[in-house]
Amino acid sequence: MHKSLIALAILSTAAHADEGMWMPQQLPQVAKQLKAAGLKLDPANLTKLTEFPMGAIVSLGGCSASFVSPQGLVATNHHCVYGSVAHNSTPERDLLANGFLAHNFGEELPAAPGSRIFVTKAVTDVSKQVVTADVAKLSGKKRSDAIEKNQKSIQAECEKDQGHRCTVSSYYGGLEYYLIKQLEIRDVRLVHAPPAGVGKFGGDTDNWMWPRHTGDYGFYRAYVSKDGKAADFSKDNVPYIPQHYLKLAKEGSKEGDFIMVLGYPGRTNRHRLPSEVAYTFDWSYPTFVKTSAENLAIIADTTKDNKDTALKYASQVASINNYYKNRQGMLDSYAGSDMLQRKTAEHEALKSWINANPARKAEYAGDIELVEKLIAQRDAETKRDYFLSSSKPRLLNTARTLYRLANENTKPDAERKSGFQVRDVPRIKSSVAALVRNYDEKVDQALVINSLSKYAALPAAQRNADFDAIIGIKDGMSKADLQAVLDTMYAGSKLGDAAERTSWIGKTPADFKASNDAFIKAAVAMYESDMKEEAQEEELGGKLQQAYANYMKAKIAFMQSKGQAVYPDANGTLRVTFGQIAGRDHGADGTTWKAFTTVEGVAAKATGVGEFNAPQAQLAAIKAKDFGKYLDPKLKSVPVAYLATLDITGGNSGSAALNAKGEWIGLAFDGILDSIISDWDFNKANTRDIQVDLRYILWNMKHVDHADNLLKEMKAE
């Protein structure tokens, strides 16, 4: 039934081909659109995950990437390797500012703790195994528990094939479930990242903007044991040999060319209810923007006199800035739109369609009403707990994770909570280890006190009584009183020491209960309350999954009846989007946007300082017009970036852009500020994404980075 829903929805498509984040197995159903758009490959080949080109596409667990050589070289965005560059940077060796290039395998650096490369091997519909006939009869927490149990069982069976990570992902609000089987490469090394003056050129000023001149590229390498199996970092490991890797385009791209992007988009919200739209744009995003601005100011103030601390928080600052501007851009677009009115009208039309037929009314009407009530309950609880969630010191949250792990370790693995099974321990260890280079007590205290003071000012009825009692929060406490409470907690803990943190992994609940460490004691005291809250969330989650899945079933049937396309919202799994390279004749700044930018734009923007500090070697090469074979005859220059009519979102960063022949032509790295609201409401006229042109990457590697070894490896020389 589930596969037929997808197939029928696509066969009746009336949507423009540029819209849609298609699952690979859906592509044969849009073969006519793909061919009409200009694809030269057989669309059926794109469904074969272990063949070319899909076999070259990988996930970094938050970004997308691709194999680009037979020796496991992986191309992605600079901002996707940023955390690893920051992790390896010190005041004496500032790789963020100066860039990094390994001239041979021996010079490559371990990526940040927890870094992974995931190669998708199979996607299988397991909907009937997850929501069995027995599960379908359940509701609330019993339903949540049963679904989780089935997911864990399916994943465990899949992971008997050692070296693989298997995940059961939900689609269409829990209507369908697919098993994603991925090779998990655990030894990831940093190979190359350009200087910040290239990879982050324009900084937050140019982020989400056009025209753009950012060289947003970087390289990792995948390593495995000598027998070719996934393994932890070891000097004895060897480069992974992928079955497939991308070939460099033989010809440059031009406006009007077919383009497709293969990657792992994170989240979109196009199937959300009107109440979810209103909640997000009236409260959630505005609150996020306000809080982000405060946090950025706090981090800037507490790190301004300490370069090492600033480096520790560089990746977090970049992330906050990115989402701050993203959310503000969405709010600006929403303010001038009729999106809520249209979503409301569409939802009312759905309900009218359901009520017009007795059979449909019997099947769907109750769940449509219920899902609206459950969403209202969920959103109210999120509002209530907003400041509480950010009022806990990072070391306290670390202690809570470690104590939870200790308790889960007393159970058989199949009975442990997802996230705390044996398969999850390496991730937890990496997270604990990463604190060495992304945590500072002074900064953490400043962030926590800002949130805690807001939380403590709430009426007692809106606060968490258990948390208050454990931490020592009372009505009427001043900021100074709260700071004194925090000072005592931080001073009473040794978890700021890396060795001390690591030592708690594997200890028993009794060890935790016997500890006098302030954060450990607080974690133990909070455990019962945490479990109670989790059970309440699962009770609501089980009800919501049941109602939301039926809502989506109704919506799919309704859209089919109107001849509209139905593709699932992005959920971090492999997708394909296609369109064409194209400018915009109505740019957000009131001008016509050309499809390409060139290196002359870099020189024009370069100031020699801050976000626009282009390397002198690059500026000299531009001035001398030393373009070589990367010259575009029509542009009479080297293209830096280009616009395309592709449907992407966060998570697509680092995705390979391919031409009609499946050749590599660039890397997707950003969207346009006035069109990122397409995460919620696709806008065909405005939506554009930005790719860094492969020719700019190669030209820069040749003339600025002098990465001749990598150019040779990729057969660019």
Specify the residue positions occupied by each region the protein language model found.
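Terminal presequence/propeptide segments associated with secretion/organelle targeting
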Residues: 2, 12-717
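Sec-dependent signal peptide recognition
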Residues: 1-7
